[in-house]
Amino acid sequence: MNLISIPAFQDNYIWLLANRQKHCVIVDPGESAPVLATLAQGQYVPQAILLTHHHNDHVGGVADLRHHFPDIPVYGPQETAKKGATVIVNDGDSLTIAGQNYTIIAVPGHTLGHIAYYSSPYLFCGDTLFSAGCGRLLEGTPEQMYASIQRLAQLPDETLICCAHEYTLSNLKFAHAILPADQDIATYQQQIEQLRSKNLPSLPVKLQFERKINVFLRCNDIDLQRKIGTTSPPDSLVSVFCELRSRKDSF
């Protein structure tokens, strides 16, 4: 499989996953022009569009892409029905597109109907889990978002996180501010600074590594809890998540 990150807007990524026959899926096309250019350059043949949620920077290119490819199915959660989705999918559904199997995972939090698509090893998770961070809670509750990222964290170590924004460096700066002595975070921040200085993407990233440098996946870390002045029994780690999310919102 060939995975391509297509830059869009200021910091979005539209994902394209193609097989050897150059049949591909397009994930969260916020705009059509860069997608059409990539399709033409690589002679890819789109088989489906996958939408994770209803925000315009993820669905804005759907109408024009369907103008160019009238028969292409557009999969998405119920909240995208008025944003171009032609096939509504729900938690636990399975899709087979261009010989690749996809499992739908409900991940409410950023929006109430947000979903992710998992096709081993690829995880297209929209604005739920970012490298070294997570999405803002625009519609859902902290409990929902914490449960969602924990659900994604249970996927296999080799899972490749294909999120929709280049937020890695800013997320690492926040993580370093919380845990300044953490060498994994400090070293990775330096690596990403070099990468971004060359305008290269920081994504995708393996989940196994993400568990080390993403503070939102480390709410049970005693040292982290001490640093933010929050201690929680295992059944209320969401309070640690809430404190982290609140601090990140104002960082």
Swiss-Prot record:
Q: What class of enzyme is it?
A: hydrolase
> Which CDD domains does this chain map to?
hydroxyacylglutathione_hydrolase_MBL-fold
What EC number(s) has UniProt assigned to this enzyme?
A: 3.1.2.6
Instruction: Give the cofactors, semicolon-separated.
Output: Zn(2+)
Task: State the free-text cofactor note.
Answer: Binds 2 Zn(2+) ions per subunit.
Q: Where does Zn(2+) 2 bind?
A: D57, H58, D127, H165
Subunit (UniProt): Monomer.
Q: What does this protein do?
A: Thiolesterase that catalyzes the hydrolysis of S-D-lactoyl-glutathione to form glutathione and D-lactic acid.
Q: What is this protein called?
A: Hydroxyacylglutathione hydrolase
Organism annotation = Yersinia pestis
